C-alpha cells in the first residue's frame, strides 16, 4: 500500500496518530471505494476529481461523482440498476477483479463473466495466492492492483505499469 501511495496510485483513508497513512487494509471496501481505488490505480485520480458528473446513478456521494463518472464513461463499471450504483454496498473480490480486467482491456461477456473472473485473472497474473475470493478486504485490492501493474494489456506486450509510465503517471525510475 505504501509503495502504491508513493506512486500516487493509492491514498488511504486518513492519517494515524503517528502521522503515517491509514490504509484501513483489514476492512472490505464499498463499491464506491473500490472504483475510487481502481481509478487512482490507473493514474487518473486527478482527472477524475475534475470530471463533472456524467453517470446516471442517484446514490453516489458527491465526493465520488468524478471517480464513478470516469469509470462509467470508460466502461470500467456499471450500476446495480439503471439509476443505482450500489455505492455503499460491499465490493466483492469478483467485482474488483472484474474492474481491473476491464481496465486491462478485457470485456465481460466476451473474455470472462463479471461474476466469475477468476480463471482469466489467474491467467493474466493479477490474482495473487494471498487474495481471499470470499472475504475481500482493502489489502486484497492492493494485492490485485500491485499484480496488475505487471500484467500485460489485452492484445499488447505493454504492461499496465508501462502504460502508466508512457502517460506520465510516474517515471520508470520511480517505479
Enumerate the predicted regions with their spans:
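Feature responds to low-complexity, polar/acidic, surface-exposed segments characteristic
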Residues: 1-2, 6-65, 73-135, 149-175
Amino acid at each position: 500500500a505504501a509503495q502504491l501511495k508513493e506512486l500516487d496510485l493509492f491514498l488511504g483513508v486518513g492519517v494515524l496518530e503517528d502521522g503515517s497513512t491509514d490504509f484501513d487494509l483489514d476492512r472490505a471496501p464499498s463499491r464506491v471505494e473500490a472504483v475510487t481505488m481502481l481509478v487512482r490505480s490507473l493514474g487518473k485520480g486527478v482527472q477524475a476529481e475534475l470530471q463533472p458528473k456524467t453517470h446516471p446513478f442517484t446514490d453516489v456521494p458527491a465526493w465520488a461523482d468524478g471517480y464513478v463518472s470516469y469509470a462509467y464513461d470508460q466502461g470500467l463499471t456499471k450500476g446495480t440498476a439503471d439509476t443505482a450504483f450500489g455505492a455503499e454496498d460491499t465490493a466483492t473480490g469478483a467485482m474488483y477483479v472484474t474492474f481491473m480486467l476491464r481496465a486491462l482491456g478485457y470485456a465481460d461477456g466476451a473474455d470472462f463473466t463479471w461474476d466469475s473472473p477468476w480463471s482469466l485473472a489467474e491467467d493474466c497474473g493479477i490474482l495473487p495466492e494471498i487474495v481471499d475470493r470470499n472475504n475481500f478486504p482493502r489489502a486484497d485490492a492492493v494485492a490485485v492492483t500491485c499484480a496488475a501493474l505487471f500484467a500485460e494489456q489485452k492484445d499488447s506486450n505493454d504492461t499496465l505499469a508501462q502504460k502508466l509510465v508512457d502517460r506520465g503517471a510516474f517515471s520508470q525510475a520511480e517505479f
